[in-house]
């Protein structure tokens, strides 16, 4: 490893530690020429093959940014997004493969996102699975109801029998235009 200060072609490892998340090793190094110390971080490279065939390094930041779009307007914190990003990275690294497809990464996102927020899950799944009809959404919602055990709409208040602002059937009501009742 070249010294970043004097460009000497060698350095000595003084200390090595695994990072808190266990995905990389932090090494303190010392240059034998100028005696200055510097830190390096060593990680195992994980490559993602995109649909176009282009290969690029896996990026937790890209995962978080993609999920952030699906969570827009939802009560999801930045901390929760960071944890989701870490879970996704751990899942794709656990496969043991050095190369993954974008499809594999998308599948790794869906599980943790479903646990985080069902609406964000549907938004992400609609893009990831390329929903192009209402039936695709209905099938995804039916699948969610089966897997999560929600027979009807999700209700945070716990009062499942109460009417909501959508009326007694739960269907959205279309407001009448002004002057239509005249």
Swiss-Prot record:
GO terms for biological process: negative regulation of DNA-templated transcription. Binds 1 zinc ion. Its cofactor is Zn(2+). Residues 46-136 form the ATP-cone domain. Residues 144-182 are annotated as: Disordered. A zinc finger (unnamed) spans 3-34. Keywords: ATP-binding, DNA-binding, Metal-binding, Nucleotide-binding, Repressor, Transcription, Transcription regulation, Zinc, Zinc-finger. Transmembrane segments: none annotated. It comes from the Bacteria. The keyword Mitochondrion does not apply. GO terms for molecular function: ATP binding; double-stranded DNA binding; zinc ion binding. Disruption phenotype: Cells up-regulate expression of nrdRJ and nrdABS transcription. A mutant in which amino acids 1 to 41 are deleted is unable to bind zinc and also unable to bind the nrdABS and nrdRJ promoters. A mutant in which amino acids 151 to 182 are deleted is able to bind to both promoters to the same extent as the wild-type. Functional zinc-finger and ATP-cone domain are required for binding to the promoter regions of both sets of RNR genes. The ATP-cone domain may function to recruit ATP/dATP to elicit a conformational change in NrdR that is necessary for binding. Seems to be allosterically activated by ATP/dATP. Belongs to the NrdR family. Negatively regulates transcription of nrdRJ (class II RNR genes) and nrdABS operon (class I RNR genes) by binding to NrdR-boxes which are proximal to or overlap with the promoter regions of class II and class Ia RNR operons, respectively. PANTHER family: TRANSCRIPTIONAL REPRESSOR NRDR. This is Transcriptional repressor NrdR. It comes from Streptomyces coelicolor (strain ATCC BAA-471 / A3(2) / M145).
């Amino acid at each position: 490893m070249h010294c970043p200060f004097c460009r000497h072609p060698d350095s000595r490892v003084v200390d090595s530690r695994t990072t808190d998340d266990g995905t990389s090793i932090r090494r303190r190094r010392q240059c034998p020429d100028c005696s200055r110390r510097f830190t390096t971080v060593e990680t195992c490279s994980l490559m993602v093959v995109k649909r176009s065939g282009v290969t690029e390094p896996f990026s937790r930041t890209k995962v978080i940014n993609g999920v952030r779009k699906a969570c827009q307007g939802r009560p999801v914190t930045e901390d929760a997004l960071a944890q989701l990003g870490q879970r996704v990275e751990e899942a794709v690294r656990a496969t043991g493969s050095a190369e993954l497809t974008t499809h594999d990464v998308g599948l790794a996102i869906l599980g943790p996102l479903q646990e985080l927020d069902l609406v964000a899950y549907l938004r992400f799944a609609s893009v990831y699975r390329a929903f192009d009809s209402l039936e695709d959404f209905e099938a995804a919602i039916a699948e969610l109801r089966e897997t999560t055990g929600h027979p009807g709409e999700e209700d945070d208040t716990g009062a499942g029998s109460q009417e909501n602002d959508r009326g007694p059937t739960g269907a959205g009501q279309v407001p009448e235009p002004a002057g239509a009742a005249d």
